[in-house]
Amino acid sequence: MELNNYQKQVMRDLSAYLDCVNRGTNLFSAWREYWFSKDVAVGLGGVPSYNNSIERAPHVCMKVPTGGGKTFMACASVRRIFDALPTGKPQVVVWLVPSDSILTQTIRTLSDVDHPYRQRLDQDFAGRVGVYTKEMLLNGQNFSPDTVREMLTVCVMSYGSLRIDSRKKDVRKVYQENGNLFRFAEYFKDTQALLADTPDTALIQVLRHLEPIVVVDESHNAESKLSTEMLNNLNPSFVLDLTATPRKNSNIISYVDARELKKEHMVKLPVVVYNRTTRQSVIQDAIQLRGSIEQEAIAAEAAGGKYIRPIVLFQAQPRTGENSDTFDKIKAMLVSMGIPENQIAVKTSDVDDLKGQNLMSRACEIRYIITVNALKEGWDCPFAYILASLANRTSTVDVEQILGRILRQPYAMQHSSPLLNTSYVLTNSVDFHTTLEKIVVG
């Protein structure tokens, strides 16, 4: 898997910024020089001034729409960043994710030697790559000063596993004395790098001493004071944020327009938005539209195209009152309309009908997925064509994130029918519709 055109431009932007950091006297001058080279002012109507929230380490963001291949670009960035850092340091990456579902997904893809993400890392580091979970690190499983010196070490962890104020016992272990890591303590030369009031053998001390590159996936979730403290506690040498919806104080070095993704057939655009007057009509029309798209998909496959089974993603309301359109009510309505139960899956914080399912498989029957917030980010399925929202969301970030779940283009290729190259949204919420229109037009 090779970088496409817009991804190559993002890599060029990163390299240009790293050059400015190495030439500059501080992070503020590097930021000004980088944007000056693009004829863009800093402040005064230009890009915002550099936000120096992480002590002594460059902290920048790539703004890439959902479906744009952020994770692959992050993998391609690692070699570039290490090449720009002082030589002789251990090559360690701490890869942070916001949820358990994304954690599992990231560990799986980075560990799979046949997956493009891992193949990119293997290509750039001559196959000498180790991927570790928090549990593996705590147990010292193939994790020692020797292995760290010899290979790229990628530590995949959740934000929550590093928050120092956590009351969870398994989280606090990161900050506790650990006999499995005593060999690392023998190598600590810079005692100023150690965290105060924390044992030398604690995992957090080991990571601080290694001064890792930190990759922050879905970084719009890591802007609180606690999250900033978490990042500073890692004593990073570089922080790379990945998100489609950066916060205002993000140091964005590269912007990718959704139209660039369309050119590369990465996403289903345009997004067609339908506003309905009742919740019942949202559900009925979503069923009918999905059926029409599936007929097009069957005809396209018969003419030599790829297999596609269109899916509707229903966004239900949280259980706040008797009139709430909760996931169980929506499922009951679908069944009453003649939809077989084996075509319906629920994905919430408590129910996970998607576990173990390969939605891209011809053997899978699922055509309707009902969620509340569990699929807001970090999940997408190219077969998801229709978002039917019964929730009254007004947050631009939340709406853009849920919209992103249906944008990825099946097989990253143009299909013969326009219906198969388009995403669809149905809603009966005026607030959701208004927020969505701003995103689509913008």
Language model features: what each stretch is:
Residues 88-122, 158-163:
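Conserved Walker A/P-loop ATP-binding site and its immediately adjacent core
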Residues 1-63:
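Conserved pre-motif I regulatory segment
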Residues 71-88:
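Walker A/P-loop NTP-binding motif
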Residues 118-180, 188-196:
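Inter-Walker segment of RecA-like/P-loop motor cores
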Residues 223-270, 285:
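Post-DEXD/H (motif II) to motif III coupling segment of the RecA-like Helicase ATP-binding lobe
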Residues 161-164, 171-241:
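SF2 helicase catalytic motif II
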Residues 352-442:
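Conserved RecA-like P-loop NTPase helicase motor core
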Residues 252-347:
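Conserved interdomain linker/interface between the two RecA-like ATPase lobes of SF2 helicase motors
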